From Swiss-Prot:
The EC number(s) this enzyme carries: 2.7.7.7, 3.1.11.1
Activity regulation details: The polymerization activity is inhibited in the presence of 2'-3'-dideoxynucleoside 5'-triphosphate (ddNTP).
Listed cofactors: Mn(2+); Mg(2+)
Reactions accelerated catalytically: DNA(n) + a 2'-deoxyribonucleoside 5'-triphosphate = DNA(n+1) + diphosphate; Exonucleolytic cleavage in the 3'- to 5'-direction to yield nucleoside 5'-phosphates
Organism whose genome encodes this protein: Bacillus subtilis (strain 168)
Comment on bound cofactor: Probably binds 2 divalent metal cations per N-terminal polymerase domain. Mn(2+) is more effective than Mg(2+) for DNA polymerase activity. Probably binds 3 Mn(2+) ions per C-terminal exonuclease domain. Mg(2+) cannot replace Mn(2+) for 3'-5' exonuclease activity.
Classification of source organism: Bacteria, Bacillati, Bacillota, Bacilli, Bacillales
Signal peptide: none
Subunit structure: Monomer.
Protein name: DNA polymerase/3'-5' exonuclease PolX
Gene giving rise to this polypeptide: polX
Residues bound to Mn(2+) 1: 339, 341, 410, 526
Region annotation DNA polymerase type-X: where it falls in the sequence: 1-315
Length: 570
């Protein structure tokens, strides 16, 4: 448990109280307590005096203490019994907060999406104070869009489901090995369904275990070589499991990894040699003999090719253009993480705790880059607080051996095109990240002018999540990617691949362009808690898909080389 868990609890209780129609002062008390914790620079393990914080009283403290001691909240459980379950999902609808939903519940008897839709269709909602005809129309539109089964899932959702499935597979008996296949193995940013290849000598036993997986809504197929199920999570998710022998595993894995175009190209090569590729192996057409391979590497070697990384198996052209001389970045080459947050802004853990987690990963360095003063919602740091934070970092650096914490900041590029700090403040930083968090709807030329201001400032080292997109949720702001890459090249400023699975920004095609131009890239997690540091794996996979070579990745370099880059404009 960390501080963010408690903040979420307090905010959730406030929302439920609002839905119930409780006294606004009680609602406010829980929101104030959440804000008090958010604004305190310490992590949960460092706080032994919560009652001394302005905003936390006896009532809210007793709720916090129960949650810490017992891992549950009787206050929240009681509220959940009193508030209709169907009201909570309505909070996801744009324009509907707790107060408005409480009004709909109290005055119209709205208790779920269906009853809200009915009230709107009967034009009852527009008659309530605080609503109108346009509000009613927007609610109906939002209800129509909510809960729709997307054709393809964002990779972040697919990864969550995959990890849950793999946790079960790793505990099954009679499985020799298993692997993801399909578009998830190729690291596509959206995924239609999940595919697994399982090597086993006991397919019947494995099949029975697969049919006992939790969350199965329906079974589509259940044979000795294939089990297909629909799993019910946030969305209904189709999963195919293919059961093969160990010797068939490499060619089956290759076949079902795809892509279609990659497989077509490989089949053409085989045909020219008088061979035929199938999921079972490589058949010599003349004799009917089928050859299998110990691994995909030997499969490709059979055709005189290097092992082509699954992430780049897309157009088929990679069969001709990829060679062993291309050194795509690997997770083990990452030496540090240069974008993360602590309790000084909106992170869940202290600088020490984040540093200790990075040391456990074997990193040589990290950068603490809390939000700047403009982002008040994230408890952004004033220039004075940056100075105070620097003292804490200095003390930790004096304590740690063979590890360096870089003093940094994630500075907002403001809507008017100026930067959130003056140059004299930035000059004191080891590393400066610049990013856009506001006014996404500005026209392209205005956005580009904002980015240019940052890129041409000699103190700015990195542009974070350069397009602002969220996969499947937000397209991001309008930018000229070619101009951005050229500016980054000219100013020798690094562009970030934000490894958060919801972002993966820069995207694949942008990474390809940046790599072609030799732009310095940096793979950062933007971690707001210790668990998010693990997103580096997803980021590296996304970087590989964009043909990112080790030589172009800033945080694959030694501390000495990183420091040289950061001082390039001195």
């Amino acid at each position: 448990m960390h501080k963010k868990d408690i903040i979420r609890l307090l905010e959730t209780i406030a929302v439920y109280m609002e839905l119930k129609g409780d006294n606004p002062f009680k609602v406010s008390a829980f929101r104030k307590a959440a804000a008090a914790l958010e604004q305190d620079d310490r992590s949960l393990s460092e706080m032994d005096d919560m009652m001394s914080l302005s905003g936390i009283g006896k009532g809210t403290y007793s709720v916090i203490k129960e949650y810490i001691d017992e891992g549950k909240s009787s206050t929240l459980e009681s509220l959940q019994k009193e508030v209709p379950e169907g009201l909570v999902p309505l909070l996801k609808l744009p324009g509907l907060g707790g107060k408005k939903i409480a009004k709909l519940y109290k005055e119209l008897g709205v208790h779920d999406a269906e009853s809200l839709k009915e009230a709107c269709e009967q034009q009852k909602v527009q008659g309530l104070a605080g609503f109108g005809k346009k509000s009613e129309e927007k609610i109906l539109q939002a209800l129509g869009e909510a809960g729709k089964q997307p054709e393809r899932f964002p990779i972040g959702y697919a990864l969550r489901i995959a990890r849950e499935i793999e946790e079960h597979l790793s505990q099954f008996t009679h499985i020799i090995k298993f692997s993801r296949a399909g578009s998830l193995r190729r690291a596509r940013e959206t995924v239609k369904d999940l595919d697994y290849i399982i090597a086993t000598d006991h397919p019947a036993e494995v099949r029975e275990q697969l049919l006992e997986l939790p969350n199965i809504k329906s079974v589509i197929a259940s044979g000795d070589t294939k089990v297909s199920v629909i799993l019910s999570f946030e969305y209904e998710t189709s999963v195919d499991f293919r059961l093969v022998t160990e010797e068939q595993f490499p060619t089956t894995l290759h076949h079902f990894t795809g892509s279609k175009d990659h497989n077509i190209k490989m089949r053409q090569i085989a045909k020219e040699r008088g061979e035929r590729i199938s999921e079972y192996g490589v058949e010599t057409v003349e004799t009917g003999e089928i050859k299998t391979f110990p691994s995909e590497r030997e499969f490709y070697a059979h055709f005189g090719l290097p092992l082509i990384p699954p992430e780049i198996r897309e157009s088929g052209q990679e069969v001709e253009t990829y060679s062993d001389s291309i050194e795509l970045i690997e997770l083990g080459q990452i030496k540090g993480d240069l974008h993360m947050h602590s309790t000084w802004s909106d992170g869940a853990f202290s600088i020490r705790e984040m540093a200790e987690a990075c040391i456990k990963k074997g990193y040589q360095y990290m950068a603490i880059t809390d939000h700047s003063q403009y982002l008040k919602v994230a408890n952004g740091l004033t220039a004075e607080r940056l100075k105070q934070q620097a003292k804490e970092i200095d003390a930790l650096n004096a304590e740690f051996e063979n590890f360096r914490i870089l003093k940094g900041v994630e500075m907002d590029i403001l809507p008017d095109g100026t930067l959130d700090y003056d140059d004299d403040v930035l000059a004191e930083m080891d590393i400066v990240i610049a990013s856009i968090h506001s006014s996404f709807n500005q026209p392209e030329h205005v956005i580009m002018k904002r980015l240019e201001t940052a890129l041409t400032n000699k103190h700015v080292d990195i542009i974070a999540h350069p397009t602002g997109r969220l996969i499947g949720r937000r397209a991001g702001y309008e930018i000229d990617i070619d101009q951005l890459i050229e500016l980054a090249r000219k100013t020798n400023t690094a562009l970030e691949l934000n490894a958060n699975p919801a972002r993966l920004d820069l995207r694949t095609e942008h990474l390809m362009k940046a790599n072609e131009q030799g732009v310095t890239l940096v793979i950062n997690t933007d971690a707001h808690n210790i668990e998010m540091l693990d997103d580096m794996k997803t980021g590296v996979t996304a970087a590989r898909k964009g043909w990112t070579e080790t030589k172009n990745v800033l945080n694959a370099r030694s501390l000495k080389d990183v420091e040289a880059f950061l001082k390039r404009n001195d």
